[in-house]
């Protein structure tokens, strides 16, 4: 197949470098499986790569819940901790923090103090995503009482690596050194329903795919092709990272 020609019929390959343009490539170990042609992110400690800009921090605001005898259920990564309010928010927060630290693996909870009294601060121990739901007195209040954030930082795009097909694996595996393109031309994986035009801005989503949508995403370069077929149902485009 003609990977460097017009790809009207042929398939491109995710993570394949393109042409003789100047390139900047660095090497960083993988914390988890990393897919070719997707953006990668440095974890909170900046020591390894993860495959998404995960919401690894969260704040749960319970400060308004001072009425006694109301049920609070906080679910974190499918594990639920509960408390029936006592009328003293500090007591209820302390109980929830204790239960979270005992029962929810890989998550550390701390109680807010001073101006943050009545809040619970959550952190993923390994920079992975926090999936949180908060129910108060039978009502889902997640949207109004839970805020999430990410310490993960965009690093570049995972380069195709032939040796990673050992034992039929088509990814970088945990602890393997990942070749990461910071600057240059590379075939990338598109987000769903994205059809870029040449020289339109290329943005990275939190999932590591590429889009033309700016809202909530990271500008990393320009598209240099339209949508092309990858393997299976995967859709790709050529991007110039800058």
Positions of PLM-derived features:
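C-terminal basic regulatory modules in eukaryotic proteins
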Residues: 137-149
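Extended, beta-strand-rich, solvent-exposed assembly scaffolds of outer structural proteins
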Residues: 59-136, 197-203
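Autoprocessing Asn-cyclization modules and mimics
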Residues: 21-24, 28, 53-71
């Amino acid at each position: 197949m003609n990977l460097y020609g017009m790809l009207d019929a042929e398939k491109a390959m995710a993570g394949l470098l393109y042409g003789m343009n100047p390139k900047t490539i660095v090497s960083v170990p993988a914390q988890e499986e990393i897919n070719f042609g997707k953006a990668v992110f440095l974890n909170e400690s900046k020591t390894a790569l993860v495959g998404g800009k995960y919401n690894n921090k969260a704040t749960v605001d319970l400060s308004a819940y001072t009425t006694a005898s109301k049920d609070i259920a906080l679910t974190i990564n499918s594990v639920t901790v509960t408390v029936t309010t006592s009328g003293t928010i500090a007591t209820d927060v302390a109980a929830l923090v204790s239960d979270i630290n005992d029962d929810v693996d890989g998550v550390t909870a701390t109680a807010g103090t001073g101006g943050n009294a009545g809040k619970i601060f959550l952190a993923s121990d390994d920079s992975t995503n926090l999936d949180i739901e908060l129910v108060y007195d039978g009502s889902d209040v997640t949207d109004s009482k839970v805020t999430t954030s990410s310490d993960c930082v965009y690093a570049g795009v995972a380069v195709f690596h032939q040796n990673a097909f050992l034992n039929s694996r088509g990814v970088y595996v945990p602890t393997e050194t990942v070749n990461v393109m910071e600057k240059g031309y590379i075939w990338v994986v598109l987000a769903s329903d994205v059809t870029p035009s040449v020289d339109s801005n290329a943005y990275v989503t939190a999932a590591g795919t590429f889009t033309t949508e700016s809202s909530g995403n990271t500008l990393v370069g320009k598209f240099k092709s339209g949508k092309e077929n990858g393997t299976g149902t995967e859709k790709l485009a050529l991007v110039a990272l800058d």
